[in-house]
């Protein structure tokens, strides 16, 4: 599994290089949902506070999910990658949010809403020398852009 091997390599690199290049990596406590299908964007636009159609692929998008009274029930970070949308959101709300999104799917819409909590991880790397760590993991720091996801 790519995420597990990347995480193991990240821990190894941080452990061996932390004296020379102090950085910190956090494995974020979050829930991850993958939405795919012909009508995925339609279902999300019906439920979220933004129109995700106005953003290009690989754009980093943030939005909210509100209940019928207008109260915020979850916050999302989106990654539109290939033919699927990855939602990173509150760890405690994962199952409830997926149920709510699923309830908003019409009988004639083609959408899969998948639990990816144990498949994908959200890792945050911080520190003055984080570019050195990224390079050792095979990521070219010059390819990183604010507001965009990078596949590697």
Per-region residue spans from a language model:
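Basic, glycine/lysine-rich polyanion-binding surfaces/domains
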Residues: 2-152
């Amino acid at each position: 599994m790519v995420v597990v091997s990347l995480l193991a390599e990240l821990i190894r690199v941080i452990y061996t290089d932390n004296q020379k290049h102090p950085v910190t990596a956090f494995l974020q406590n979050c829930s991850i949902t993958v939405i795919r299908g012909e009508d995925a964007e339609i279902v999300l636009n019906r439920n979220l506070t933004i129109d995700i159609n106005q953003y290009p692929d690989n754009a980093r998008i943030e939005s909210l999910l509100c209940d019928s009274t207008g109260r915020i029930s979850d916050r999302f970070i989106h990654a539109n990658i290939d033919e699927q949308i990855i939602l990173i959101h509150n760890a405690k709300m994962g199952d409830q949010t997926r149920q709510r999104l699923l309830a908003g799917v019409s009988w004639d819409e083609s959408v899969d809403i998948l639990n990816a909590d144990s498949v994908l991880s959200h890792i945050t790397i911080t520190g003055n020398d984080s570019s050195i760590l990224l390079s050792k993991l095979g990521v070219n720091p010059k390819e990183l852009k604010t507001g965009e996801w990078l596949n590697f």
